[in-house]
Amino acid sequence: MISQTAQKELNKLLEGNKNFIEGKPTAKNMCLKTLQSLALYQEPYACVLSCSDSRVVPEIIFDCGIGELFVVRVAGIAVGPNVKESIEYAVKKLHVPLLILLGHDDCGVMKYANEQYPEMPEHFQSILKSVYPVIDGKG
């Protein structure tokens, strides 16, 4: 069950996504006063865990302004210790009531992991190890 606060924030994101899909985004939070206040503190209303793919930009997809979302981006949405700690910071310190997991089609990391499975280059191990359970159907 979702809290009333989280539902309210989810509705904002859904409305923003509707604006994006319809090609009618609204300009938000770009005035100098807002930018200056954001230099002092942040008060996002949602945390979005997203792939680092350059085509997936949560602020644009949800038609949000600067400071409205706490965005954690990582290739393949691979959740490791740093990602977990970032999300925990958003929830415990910034008190965001809503966590969104934003995936996408045609993920290059997932394709690469699938092509290399079970062999993987050492420098990709931490990312690919976290997506292999998904490829195996165990995640």
Language-model regions, residue ranges each:
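Glycine/small-residue-rich phosphate/adenosyl-binding loop
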Residues: 43-45, 51
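Divalent-metal-activated hydrolytic enzyme cores
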Residues: 1-43, 66-67, 76-95, 108-139
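Divalent metal-coordination and catalytic microenvironments
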Residues: 13, 48, 72, 101
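Short glycine-enriched loops at secondary-structure junctions
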Residues: 50-55, 75-78, 104-105
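Terminal alpha-helical anchor/extension segments at protein ends
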Residues: 1, 8, 51, 58-62
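Catalytic core of membrane glycerolipid acyltransferases/transacylases, capturing the structured
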Residues: 46, 55-72
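Poly-acidic low-complexity segments
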Residues: 29-31, 53, 57
